[in-house]
Amino acid sequence: MKPTTIASLQKCKQDKKRFATITAYDYSFAKLFAEEGLNVMLVGDSLGMTVQGHDSTLPVTVADIAYHTAAVRRGAPNCLLLADLPFMAYATPEQAFENAATVMRAGANMVKIEGGEWLVETVQMLTERAVPVCGHLGLTPQSVNIFGGYKVQGRGDEASDQLLSDALALEAAGAQLLVLECVPVELAKRITEALAIPVIGIGAGNVTDGQILVMHDAFGITGGHIPKFAKNFLAETGDIRAAVRQYMAEVESGVYPGEEHSFH
C-alpha cells in the first residue's frame, strides 16, 4: 500500500475531497483501520481518559505517547501518523524539539500541539528541524482548567477573530495541518477557507477539509458524557469494520457531522 502523506491531505483539500481521521492507541485497532482504508491516525493524549482512566488529559507523559505511537505504527506502517505532545511537553521551543524527537523516533510523522500565536517560535523551530507540525485551536483539552470546563470556543466577534488570527499565525510559522475543536460552524468555515493547509474538525461542523473522532466515541464505548459532536457508528452497523467504512463514507459525503452534531 502506498504511504499516506501530508501531501495526500493537501491534494484532498485542493480537490475538495473530504477525508476521515481517527484516534488510535494500539496495534490491533491501527491494523484494522488501515485494512479498511482509514489511513490517517492520531495518537492523542485523549488516551489519558479513554485508556488510562484519568478525568483529563493532563497526566499523560511523553513516554506514554511514544509507547502507543510505536504500537500504532507497527499496526499501520503506511498510515500518516500524528502524535500529541502532551501537557507541559512544549513549554519552550527547546523542550518541544526534544520531546518531538522522542515521538518521531517512535514512529510519528507529525506532532500536534495545542495553542495559538504564542507557539509561533516553537512551530518555526520544529519545522526548520524537519519536524512537521499540526496545530490545534478552539477547545484545547490541555487548557481545561483555564476554560473552566469543556466548552465551545470562538463565539462572538472578538473570540472568533482571535482564533482566525491564531490559525493564520500558525500556518505562517510552518504548521502543515490544523485541528479545530468545538467551534461554531461559521467560524470553522472562515478558517478553513482562509488557510491553504488542510483543516480537520471535531465539533466544527462539516465545513472543514477533514474530520476526526476519538475511536471510543465512534464506537460508543465511552462511559459517561457523550459529546454532542460524537456519533456511534457501531450501533448502526453492529460490526466494527462496517462502522469504520460508514464513518469514512459519511465524512466523505458530508452527511457526518450533521446539524445535530454542530455548534453555532
From Swiss-Prot:
<feature type="binding site">
    <location>
        <position position="114"/>
    </location>
    <ligand>
        <name>Mg(2+)</name>
    </ligand>
</feature>
<keyword id="KW-0808">Transferase</keyword>
<feature type="binding site">
    <location>
        <position position="84"/>
    </location>
    <ligand>
        <name>Mg(2+)</name>
    </ligand>
</feature>
<feature type="binding site">
    <location>
        <position position="45"/>
    </location>
    <ligand>
        <name>Mg(2+)</name>
    </ligand>
</feature>
<feature type="binding site">
    <location>
        <begin position="45"/>
        <end position="46"/>
    </location>
    <ligand>
        <name>3-methyl-2-oxobutanoate</name>
    </ligand>
</feature>
<keyword id="KW-0566">Pantothenate biosynthesis</keyword>
<feature type="binding site">
    <location>
        <position position="84"/>
    </location>
    <ligand>
        <name>3-methyl-2-oxobutanoate</name>
    </ligand>
</feature>
<comment type="function">
    <text>Catalyzes the reversible reaction in which hydroxymethyl group from 5,10-methylenetetrahydrofolate is transferred onto alpha-ketoisovalerate to form ketopantoate.</text>
</comment>
<dbReference type="InterPro" id="IPR003700">
    <property type="entry name" value="Pantoate_hydroxy_MeTrfase"/>
</dbReference>
<keyword id="KW-0963">Cytoplasm</keyword>
<dbReference type="GO" id="GO:0005737">
    <property type="term" value="C:cytoplasm"/>
</dbReference>
<dbReference type="GO" id="GO:0015940">
    <property type="term" value="P:pantothenate biosynthetic process"/>
</dbReference>
<dbReference type="InterPro" id="IPR040442">
    <property type="entry name" value="Pyrv_kinase-like_dom_sf"/>
</dbReference>
<feature type="binding site">
    <location>
        <position position="112"/>
    </location>
    <ligand>
        <name>3-methyl-2-oxobutanoate</name>
    </ligand>
</feature>
<protein>
    <recommendedName>
        <fullName>3-methyl-2-oxobutanoate hydroxymethyltransferase</fullName>
        <ecNumber>2.1.2.11</ecNumber>
    </recommendedName>
</protein>
<keyword id="KW-0460">Magnesium</keyword>
<keyword id="KW-0479">Metal-binding</keyword>
<feature type="active site" description="Proton acceptor">
    <location>
        <position position="181"/>
    </location>
</feature>
<dbReference type="GO" id="GO:0000287">
    <property type="term" value="F:magnesium ion binding"/>
</dbReference>
<dbReference type="Pfam" id="PF02548">
    <property type="entry name" value="Pantoate_transf"/>
</dbReference>
<comment type="subunit">
    <text>Homodecamer; pentamer of dimers.</text>
</comment>
<comment type="pathway">
    <text>Cofactor biosynthesis; (R)-pantothenate biosynthesis; (R)-pantoate from 3-methyl-2-oxobutanoate: step 1/2.</text>
</comment>
<dbReference type="GO" id="GO:0003864">
    <property type="term" value="F:3-methyl-2-oxobutanoate hydroxymethyltransferase activity"/>
</dbReference>
<dbReference type="InterPro" id="IPR015813">
    <property type="entry name" value="Pyrv/PenolPyrv_kinase-like_dom"/>
</dbReference>
<comment type="similarity">
    <text>Belongs to the PanB family.</text>
</comment>
